[in-house]
């Protein structure tokens, strides 16, 4: 009570959630008629669905979605999409702008190339380590191979399996060796009737081509050609065909 014996009224301010001034906002909102906000003191408690509907309507007007002039620019889908991203009870500044973080295609390709280079480098290091490892099975297998102690069949199988190595003679050198046809009919040839090719262990037949080595040993031309392409020594005396003869 004051000196005039009149009751002092407390002023209460209500947060309406509208960005406009109180007088202007109500006039614009209700079509130009100045009207105060309705008193909801005696209204029943609003259900969550009703509260959501009221918030959507007020926010729609707040963000400029209402009105016939804005209908062509903002449809109901845009308004609902915008409001669905907002949570009731949170202010606008609580929402951070969404940034679409996408990998740059150039960065993706660079990472793929880097991963590929790392894998290739690891494989290369592993191969080098195996080559220098004396306990490697491959190294042991290669050390156990001695073409000088292998039979013709073993050399042929080895050549077909791993390919011929340049320990033998070239085809041009082999073709320079003298050849002749085997003949049977004379006295001297009868004495050699039981001769066989040491390589294939088959008897010579009339008309078959024979090849004479510098060491005077004779073989089937086909058999000795295959042998010399793998090993350049004579199968009998181990003398090099185009080198110094071995002394036994």
UniProtKB/Swiss-Prot annotation:
Gene3D superfamilies: Zinc/RING finger domain, C3HC4 (zinc finger) (3.30.40.10)
Reaction catalysis annotation: S-ubiquitinyl-[E2 ubiquitin-conjugating enzyme]-L-cysteine + [acceptor protein]-L-lysine = [E2 ubiquitin-conjugating enzyme]-L-cysteine + N(6)-ubiquitinyl-[acceptor protein]-L-lysine
Gene Ontology molecular function, alphabetical: ubiquitin conjugating enzyme binding; ubiquitin-protein transferase activity; zinc ion binding
Zinc finger (RING-type): 197-238
UniProt keyword list: Developmental protein, Metal-binding, Transferase, Ubl conjugation, Ubl conjugation pathway, Zinc, Zinc-finger
Disruption phenotype: Enlarged floral organs (e.g. petals and sepals) and thick stems mainly due to altered numbers of normally sized cells. Enhanced da1-1 phenotype leading to increased seed and organ size.
Distribution of this protein across tissues and organs: Mostly expressed in inflorescence, and, to a lower extent, in seedlings, roots, stems, leaves and siliques.
Enzyme's top EC category: transferase
Induction: Rapid turn-over by proteasome-mediated degradation (at protein level).
Recorded superkingdom: Eukaryota
Gene Ontology process terms (BP): floral organ development; negative regulation of cell population proliferation; negative regulation of organ growth; positive regulation of leaf senescence; protein autoubiquitination; protein ubiquitination
EC number: 2.3.2.27
Pathway: Protein modification; protein ubiquitination
Record PTM text: Auto-ubiquitinated.
Note: Plants overexpressing BB exhibit early senescence.
Record text on subunit structure and interactions: Interacts with the E2 ubiquitin conjugating enzyme UBC10 via the RING domain. Interacts with DA1.
General function of this protein: E3 ubiquitin-protein ligase that limits organ size, and possibly seed size, in a dose-dependent manner. Negatively regulates the duration of cell proliferation in leaves and petals independently of the major phytohormones (e.g. auxin, cytokinin, gibberellin, brassinosteroids, ethylene, abscisic acid, jasmonic acid), probably by targeting growth stimulators for degradation. Limits the proliferation of root meristematic cells. Polyubiquitinates DA1. Involved in the promotion of leaf senescence, in addition to its function in restricting plant growth.
Protein name in UniProt: E3 ubiquitin-protein ligase BIG BROTHER
Origin species: Arabidopsis thaliana
Source organism phylogeny: Eukaryota, Viridiplantae, Streptophyta, Embryophyta, Tracheophyta
Gene from which this protein is expressed: BB
């Amino acid at each position: 009570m004051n000196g005039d014996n009149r009751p002092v009224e407390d002023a209460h301010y209500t947060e309406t959630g509208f960005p406009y001034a109180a007088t202007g906002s109500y006039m614009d909102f209700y079509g130009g008629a100045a009207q105060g906000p309705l008193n909801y003191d005696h209204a029943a408690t609003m259900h969550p669905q009703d509260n959501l509907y009221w918030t959507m309507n007020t926010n729609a007007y707040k963000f400029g979605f209402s009105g016939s002039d804005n209908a062509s620019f903002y449809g109901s889908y845009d308004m609902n999409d915008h409001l669905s991203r907002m949570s009731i009870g949170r202010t606008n500044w609580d929402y951070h702008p969404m940034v679409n973080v996408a990998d740059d295609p150039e960065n993706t390709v660079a990472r793929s190339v880097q991963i590929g280079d790392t894998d290739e480098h690891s494989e290369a290091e592993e191969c080098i380590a195996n080559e220098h490892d004396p306990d490697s099975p491959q190294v042991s297998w290669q050390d156990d191979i001695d073409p000088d102690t292998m039979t013709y069949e073993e050399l042929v199988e080895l050549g077909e399996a791993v390919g011929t190595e340049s320990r033998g003679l070239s085809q041009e050198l082999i073709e320079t060796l003298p050849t002749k046809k085997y003949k049977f009919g004379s006295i001297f040839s009868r004495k050699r009737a039981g001769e066989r090719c040491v390589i294939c262990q088959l008897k010579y037949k009339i008309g078959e081509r024979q090849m004479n080595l510098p060491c005077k040993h004779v073989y089937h031309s086909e058999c000795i050609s295959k042998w010399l392409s793998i090993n350049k020594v004579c199968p009998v005396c181990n003398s090099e065909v185009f080198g110094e003869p071995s002394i036994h």
